Amino acid sequence: MSAPILTSAAFPAKQLKVGGVTAFSATDYPGKFAAVVFVQGCPWHCGYCHNPHLQKRTGHSPLAWSQVLAHLQRRVALIDAVVFSGGEPTMDPALAEAMRQVHALGFGVGLHSAGIYPRRLAEVLPLVDWVGIDVKASSPAYDGVTGSSDSARLALESAEAVLASGAAYEFRTTVHPALHTPEDILALAQTLRALGVRHYALQVFRATGCADEGLKATSTADYPGAELVAQVSGLFKTFTLRRE
């Protein structure tokens, strides 16, 4: 069951649990220069996660939101947008109010989410200018990747919410040969196309930050192969392959 919606009035932005900030990124929001705010906490345990240090939601926030906001105020006219990433940002009930404060500074708002909390995602989508949705696997393989039951259903609900919202988006999947067979990848792409997804990316597993030694040892830079990439590419209006 997805988490209940908790209003921003009850959770002011100062309560946002920030795990870190990247001052400048040209890759986290397509076509924009952005700062990235990393929010603590994620209930899923994907083996290929490159931010495992953010999975635990602690009582202490390494950075106060007031510090982050002051930093962003100094970046006005230097960057275009602020992306909330994680962890899973929608886990934090203070996210909506933090987004409003970012908008008030004149920045665009981006969001990276795995769609773990469909109702919370739906709450913040009206505040989002662009959202990147991490789709983990085809439905039968989903729980094996996330380490959590019922994860495919939650992801599907979130995908439907994003498509219904009208927000600019990208769906993307990080692939590893030990987790995703070519058949799985193609089946997932076909499912997304049938849902109405038009913008999709495949991202090759990155060893940087990953805590799973087995996945690091069995990764290969040439997976997926060119034939599969061509099949997937043809299903979408825009398609991106990220090998780095």
Where are these regions (language model features)?
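Conserved AdoMet/S-adenosylmethionine-binding subsite of the radical SAM
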Residues: L69-A81, T90-A217
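Auxiliary Fe-S-binding modules of radical SAM enzymes
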Residues: M1-T27, G31, P177-E244
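Glycine-rich phosphate-binding "P-loop"
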Residues: L54-H60, A81-E88
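Short beta-strand segments
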Residues: Q40, S85, D134
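Short, well-ordered turn and helix-capping elements at secondary-structure junctions
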Residues: T22-S25, H53, G86-E88, G115, ...
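Canonical Radical SAM [4Fe-4S] cluster-binding loop centered on the CxxxCxxC motif
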Residues: L6, T27-L63
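Non-heme iron-sulfur electron-transfer modules
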Residues: F11-K17, K56-A70
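Flexible, glycine- and charge-enriched loops at secondary-structure boundaries
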Residues: T58-P62, S148-A152, T218, D222-G225
